[in-house]
Every structure is written in C-alpha cells, then in structure tokens.
C-alpha cells in the first residue's frame, strides 16, 4: 500500500481548494445575478413598502459580501456556498412570483377606460346580412340615451358604405326595440349595455334570438380620475372606501353593463374593521344622470362605472375612493383557482334557477359554478333580492378569507391571472403599496361586518324603463341606519350590527 508524499498531499489540497474556489466564484456569480434581478423587480413592483425594500436590499448585499469573503477558507467557504445556493434558488423563485404579481396588478390598474359595444340589429328572419343590404333603410336610434356613441357609430357606418343614412329617433329603449318587433323599422342601433334592461321585460326576453347582428362597434371612453371630494360627504384619512361592482355577463370587465352586485367596502385602518354594505340591484333611487328621476340602481352601470359610484355617493352621503369592477361570471375562475371556498348560508334551499344545486344551512364548500348559482338565487327566499345581496356578500367574504390564507400560495400564479383577467380598478400601484405598508406595520386582524339595506316590492316606471317594472322601494329607516354605521366607521368607533 503506497503512502502519499507531502508533495502529492500538497497538490491534492491545492486542487481541492482550486475546485472550491472555482465553484465558489460560479455560485457567487449566480447569487449576484439573482440578487440584482430580485432587487430590480422588488423595486419595480412597488407594492412592498420602501422601508422593507431597503432592509431586504441591505441584507442581500451583506450576505453577498460575507459569502465573498469566506471563500478564502475551506470550511466557512463550504457552509456559505450552501447558503449561496439555497438563497439563489429562493431569489429566483421569488423573482418569478414578484414578476407575476407585478403583471397582475399592472394589468388590473393600467386600464383607465370603459368600453361600450353598439350593434346594428335586424330581425333574425330578415334577408339582411351586411350594412350594404340596409343602406336604403331608416335606422332606428335613441333620441338622448347614449347619443354621443350612437352619433359616432352613424358616422362610421356612413363612411363604410359611402352613403348618408336616414335615422329615426325614439325616446327610450323599449320604444326603439318595439318598433323593430312591430316592423315599423327594419334596423336599429343599440348598445349592448342596454340588453340587461331588455331582459327584465317579458315582451323582449327573446331579443337575442329574435334579432341578429350585422355590424358591431366598440367605443372607448376615458374614465375621469380626479381627487375631488365632496366636502358634504363623509371622508377620513384613515378610512378607505371601495365600491365593488359585479357585472354578471360574459365579456371584458371594462364593458358598461348592468351592475348586479353593488357592495361598498369601507376599511378603517385604525379600528381594524371592514364594513361590507350591500345595496340591492333593483333599489329605486335617482342616479347621477337621471335628473332626479328614480331608476334601478343596476341600470346606473349601463351609463358607466362613474355613474354607479356617484349614485351610491348620493344615496349614502359618502365619498367613494376607488372602485373594483368585476366580471362576476369570471369570478368562477378565481374561486376554482382557489380550489373552492367555504360560504355560509343562512338558509337551506334548492336553487330554482339551476337544477342540481342544493345548499344547507351553515357552511357549504363551493366551486366557482356553485358560488355563482348561490349568488344569483333570489326566488328561493321570502325576501328575494334582499337575501341575494346577503349571499353575494357571503361569497365575497369567503373569497377574501381564502385569499388572506396560506392556501393562496398553493396556486398563486393561476389565482392572480384569474383576478387580473376578470377585474379592473382605478386604484394606483402606489395606493395598493400604501395599504400593504399599513397592513405590514400594524399587522391588522380585520373584523369584517356586513349590513344590507332593504325595502319593499313595487312596480313602477324607471328612468331607463318607461313602463312599470319590478323595483325595490328603499326603506328610509334602514338607509339611515346604514348611514349611521358608515359615520361610526369614519369616526373611529367600533360598529356592532343590531
């Protein structure tokens, strides 16, 4: 058995040290790149408070320095190589997650416009298939509602077919559509935002099958983002008020449609309370565009998200800081990406809208489809739309709790993609960062309370519907109670729902 000479031992040690040094330099290079990329993305995301960003940056630079210095020694160098490798993996994974987060927030916050789709309709049994076929026909249009967009569409049509078209004005949606049904005219221009209004009228429930579209136009309108507050309305520095609007249709959340979900979320960062205030979709109130004439609250969404915001501000005497507009049909994908949510039901019932869905009193684990059925149901309850509003808040509450739990991490990227694809908001990245900063510094354990205004059933004409239609006449006492709760939130008082 040969013995190792001093020269051979020295050579072997030299080779080991050289190998360790080379591997150390390689790991340092990876760690350096991973650190720089992570720091850049962390700074870009802006949802992490600056104090925390600085602390993280200093810590990462310190670790990098220690790893660099210790490479001259064998044992400390081996230990820091392991640390470097693990840290590099964490930084790479963290960079991916941060970038996904940034992309999702940017997608939801960068949209500063609403869209309105106007279609050219003819009867489904007619011979007309394209604009050229109807250029000699008289086009039915609405006299005042959505007139700016309508006039722009008329100009586009005239340019396309190189002909000046004749138009006939109608006072409202009903008379316009009725003229098409009665063959008084053969072609009309109508915005899809008004289709929800037609759905509430028995005589026009078949509109989608009775008609066909021969041309379609999408109009964009910039949203006014100003910081003007009404001094007569409630407004506090430590209170943030969000309006959650849910449009229950397929299509992009930017589209103006009936707002079927109307929840005001008021957060007090001092008391740690969140008040969820639901207003039924059929609440009979003046809107900001109706000149004092009452309309269904849901119809405000047809005229834009700003109309819904202003209408609720008028009703409750508050300033709404931001809106979150959600495609409630797309809400299914959010819940499915969370692998379902546990929703509390006040009643046991079987859905009368969709067969095969039964809910027990108490907690029900729901996938996206079940949650949507649960949120839409009203015919199973004596209080109808009142209970539907409560159920919608229960679903929102369940989703918020799931998002705040560790379950979010199990399917993080899919959840964020679902959220960003189905919602838009006028909250800036800076405001989101401010709220995150408050949460991190105070570690608030939020107390979520719910209240829903109610009313009595009625059958009255609306601003958007001239013939009598189902509405909910507000209970003034309940509305005043809601105002009292809102004032307490703004006055830093704890709210207890009576």
Label the model's feature ranges.
Residues 1-11:
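Short, Lys/Arg-rich, polar N-terminal cytosolic tail immediately upstream
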Residues 11-25, 51-54, 74-81:
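Membrane-water interface of alpha-helical transmembrane segments
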Residues 20-69:
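Membrane-embedded alpha-helical segments of integral membrane proteins
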Residues 77-99:
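Internal/C-terminal transmembrane anchor helices
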Residues 82-90, 129-132, 266-267:
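A short, flexible N-terminal coil/short beta segment enriched in small residues
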Residues 94-111:
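Hydrophobic alpha-helical transmembrane segments in integral membrane proteins
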Residues 109, 113, 123-124, 130-132, ...:
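Non-catalytic, solvent-exposed segments at the cell envelope interface
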């Amino acid at each position: 058995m040969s013995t190792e000479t001093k020269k051979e031992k020295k050579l072997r040690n030299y080779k080991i040290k050289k190998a360790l040094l080379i591997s150390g330099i390689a790991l340092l290079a990876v760690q350096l790149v991973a650190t720089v990329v992570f720091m850049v993305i962390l700074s870009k995301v802006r949802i992490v408070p600056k104090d925390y960003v600085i602390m993280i940056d200093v810590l990462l630079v310190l670790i990098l320095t220690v790893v660099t210095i210790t490479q001259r020694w064998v044992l400390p160098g081996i230990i820091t190589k392991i640390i470097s490798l693990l840290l590099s993996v964490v930084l790479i994974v963290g960079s991916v997650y941060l970038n996904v987060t940034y992309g999702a927030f940017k997608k939801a916050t960068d949209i500063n416009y609403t869209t309105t789709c106007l279609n050219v309709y003819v009867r489904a049994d007619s011979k007309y298939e394209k604009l050229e076929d109807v250029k000699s026909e008289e086009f039915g249009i609405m006299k005042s509602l959505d007139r700016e967009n309508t006039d722009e569409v008329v100009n586009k049509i005239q340019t396309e077919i190189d002909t000046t078209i004749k138009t006939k004005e109608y006072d409202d949606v009903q008379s316009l559509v009725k003229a098409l049904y009665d063959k008084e005219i053969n072609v009309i221009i109508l915005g899809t935002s008004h289709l929800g209004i037609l759905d509430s009228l028995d005589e026009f429930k078949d509109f989608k099958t009775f008609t066909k579209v021969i041309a379609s136009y999408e109009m964009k309108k910039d949203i006014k983002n100003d910081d003007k507050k009404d001094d007569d309305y409630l407004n506090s520095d430590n209170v943030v008020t969000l309006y959650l609007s849910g449009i229950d249709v397929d299509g992009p959340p930017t589209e103006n449609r009936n707002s079927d979900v109307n929840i005001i979320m008021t957060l007090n960062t001092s008391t740690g309370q969140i008040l969820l205030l639901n207003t039924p979709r059929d609440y009979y109130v003046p809107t900001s565009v109706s000149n004092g004439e009452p309309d269904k609250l849901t119809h405000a969404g047809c005229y834009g998200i700003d109309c819904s915001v202003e209408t609720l501000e008028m009703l409750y005497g508050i300033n709404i800081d931001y809106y979150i507009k959600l495609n409630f049909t797309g809400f299914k994908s959010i819940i499915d990406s969370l692998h379902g949510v546990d929703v509390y039901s006040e009643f046991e019932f079987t859905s009368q809208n969709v067969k095969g869905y039964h809910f027990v009193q108490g907690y029900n684990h729901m996938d996206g489809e079940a949650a949507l059925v649960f949120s839409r149901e009203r015919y199973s309850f004596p209080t109808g739309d009142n209970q539907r509003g409560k159920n919608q808040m229960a679903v929102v509450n369940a989703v918020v709790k799931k998002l705040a739990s560790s379950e979010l991490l199990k399917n993080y990227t899919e959840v964020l993609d679902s959220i960003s694809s189905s919602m838009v908001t006028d909250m800036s990245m800076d405001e989101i960062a401010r709220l995150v900063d408050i949460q991190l510094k105070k570690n608030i354990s939020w107390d979520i309370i719910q209240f829903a205004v109610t009313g009595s059933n009625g059958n009255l004409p609306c601003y958007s519907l001239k013939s009598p239609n189902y509405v909910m006449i507000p209970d003034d006492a309940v509305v005043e109670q809601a105002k009292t709760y809102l004032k307490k939130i703004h006055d830093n008082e704890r709210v207890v729902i009576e």
